[in-house]
A protein has these predicted regions:
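Extracellular and analogous surface-interaction loops
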Residues: 501-513, 549-554
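Bacterial N-terminal signal peptides
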Residues: 2-10
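Accessory carbohydrate-binding/adhesion or oligomerization-edge regions at the termini
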Residues: 415-487, 561-591
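Extracellular beta-rich ligand/substrate-recognition surface
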Residues: 489-499, 536-541
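Beta-strand-rich ligand-recognition modules
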Residues: 527-574
């Protein structure tokens, strides 16, 4: 069967197929207010294709697209012709109504709006390093590019702009090599990044005052402090104009979080950190704007699979797909549209995400995972070879999740989600230690995290140890209101280190107690010298991802956490006494 015929059959089947239960173990309710939350796809989709097949997406619960390759990166001129979607246009810069890409996009957006797809946006990325923060001329040029993008988006009847700031993560850290040059004004760096965020957003608002703005990923929890400063500057500019479209932070840490508790913890963490960043900026107007018009949009990644292929030295040499389909053959990052998790897991994730979302849930499409074109269609629509690759056999199961939206039948989860999406969840979790004592950082064998080191053999608060930073001893530090023990902030960027954290609890009697734990990345938890939990992988830290059952003796007990980093921008953990234990008179104490 040719791809175009298969696509037509899929299209027809979507009109008649009835919803079915995709997860017999979960309990769902039909969403009684399905219009409250809109579903958006992040996708490379040709405008001509979307124009012709918009009814298919509308019928399957899609409300918008973050459209890539209209303006790829910050340094691009959106008016320049030709483009991938207008390959036959004469070369040159065509500004305004005569621009062929603008006309094409406007026609598509008008068609989409007629069918209820109202939230298309131009997706722009920081694919190239930004200019130096203090280069005024270069930043004026950058802001002008974004201003023109906003003008184009407004004239083409997009609903707004999506900005992806992911690809220059190293620039957001204060130890970036360019900032270490003698004479560089490092003391002004953070305020300058905030100012650039204001300028960037002001340029877009000037061109498109009513735009909706999506920002991805959750930079305040994923990157260094300059990303948070950029974010706070953007919110300040939006708040100054009380821009009606709002700012919507699109989370990526939630991509494969199919368990509701994990999804809840990640969205909660992002919102609390966002409020902390804005409060620290001392711009009360920005914080109030966030609470009125800001939101976290949970990101999901059900389809589109890839894995790295490494050489003997551990260097990446390419990407493969599912091993059972492609073995270790290098096929490219976007060549396998297979599932990352089942339709049943997607149903559960989407049902939880709808409760947590204030306005939007977004789905990352790693490749053109929800459609397949024939080669003739690819040419006609000016699409790409990826559009012609086969979709999963049970695509309809995934589409039905979107077409017939459900929410979890769990009143406790629903009530907690409402607090989080309304930015009122600050004290939702309790039982965190007010202080921890930390020792580190230490180097460790990534293949042997379990190997005992001196601090876990004997606890001596007065002893000195040789660490990666020189001689060190136990240091007492407070825990912020989110409960996250941020070892990366405490120790700075190290090369995949580990550290020890120490605290004490007191129990009124001998009793069973539950501890909620979550770590980034690997960790062992010891209670009174005995290992009660061990995880030797890589993951995001999520509140209560693991529930650790222990029996505490009457009196004082020692809790030691050994936490290791396996790369990335984050390293730390959550550990708390669960509520029932608090009622039974278990509390944090000093030694």
């Amino acid at each position: 069967m040719v791809a175009g015929t298969a696509w037509l059959l899929l299209f027809c089947s979507c009109r008649s197929q009835k919803p079915g239960s995709v997860d017999q173990g979960a309990h769902y309710l039909a969403d009684s207010n399905p219009e409250r939350v809109k579903t958006i796809l992040f996708a490379t989709i040709a405008p001509d294709f979307l124009y012709e097949r918009a009814d298919f997406f509308a019928q399957n619960g899609i409300h918008g697209f973050m459209m890539a390759h209209i303006m790829a990166s910050w340094q691009d001129d959106i008016w320049k012709q030709p483009t991938a979607y207008t390959p036959h246009a004469p070369a040159g810069r065509v500004v305004g109504e005569a621009n062929p890409l603008l006309r094409k996009c406007r026609r598509t957006n008008q068609r989409c709006r007629e069918l209820g797809i109202e939230y298309n946006s131009v997706k722009v990325a920081f694919y190239k390093n930004l200019p130096d923060w203090f280069d005024d001329a270069a930043w004026r040029a950058l802001c002008e590019n974004f201003h023109q993008c906003a003008v184009f988006s407004r004239l083409a009847q997009f609903s707004g702009i999506t900005l992806d700031i992911e690809y220059i993560a190293e620039m957001y850290h204060l130890d970036y090599p360019a900032y270490q040059v003698a004479g560089y004004p490092r003391d002004r760096l953070r305020s300058q990044a905030q100012q650039r965020g204001q300028e960037l957003m002001a340029a877009m608002i000037k061109g498109f005052p009513d735009m909706i703005f999506w920002l991805l990923p959750e930079c305040m929890t994923m990157y260094g402090p300059l990303a948070s400063d950029l974010f706070s500057g953007m919110v300040s500019a939006l708040a100054e104009k009380d821009s009606p479209g709002g700012i919507h932070v699109c989370s990526e840490g939630t991509y494969t979080a199919t368990k509701p508790r994990a999804l809840f913890g990640l969205v909660y963490k992002t919102d609390i950190k966002s409020q902390q960043v804005l409060a620290a900026s001392a711009d009360q107007q920005a914080l109030e704007y966030w609470r009125r018009r800001g939101s976290i949009s949970p990101g999901l990644w059900p389809l589109g699979y890839y894995r790295e292929i490494l050489d003997a030295a551990g260097n990446r040499i390419g990407y493969a797909g599912k091993k059972e389909k492609f073995g270790d053959r290098i096929i490219g990052s976007y060549a396998d549209k297979s599932e990352n998790y089942s339709a049943a897991e997607f149903q559960r994730q989407y049902a939880a995400g709808r409760l947590l979302a204030r306005r939007f849930v977004w789905i990352y499409c790693h490749g053109q995972v929800f459609w397949q074109l024939s080669k003739e269609e690819m040419i006609r629509f000016h699409a790409s070879a990826g559009d012609t690759l086969p979709v999963v056999d049970n695509l309809q199961d995934y589409l039905d999740v979107l077409r017939y939206p459900k929410i979890l039948q769990d009143s406790s989860f629903a009530n907690g989600s409402r607090l989080v999406r309304e930015h009122q969840g600050l004290n939702y979790f309790t039982g965190f230690a007010p202080y921890w004592r930390h020792l580190g950082p230490f180097a460790f064998d990534q293949k042997n995290f379990s190997m005992p080191m001196a601090p876990e053999k004997t606890i001596d608060l007065q002893a000195e140890y040789t660490t990666l930073s020189g001689q060190g001893c136990w240091q007492k530090t407070p825990v912020d209101s989110s409960g996250y023990v941020d070892l990366a902030s405490l120790y700075g960027n190290q090369k995949m280190p580990l550290a020890y954290s120490l605290a004490w609890v007191a129990s009124a009697k001998k009793q069973p107690v539950q501890l909620g734990f979550g770590c980034n990345d690997c960790a062992t938890v010891f209670v009174n010298g005995k290992s009660v939990f061990h995880f030797d992988g890589s993951r995001n830290a999520v509140i209560d991802e693991d529930i650790i059952a222990v029996t505490l003796p009457a009196g004082r007990s020692q809790i030691l956490v050994k936490c290791g980093d396996r790369g990335g921008s984050h390293w730390g953990f959550y550990l708390r006494i669960l509520e029932q234990a608090e009622k039974n008179k278990v509390r944090w104490v000093e030694p």
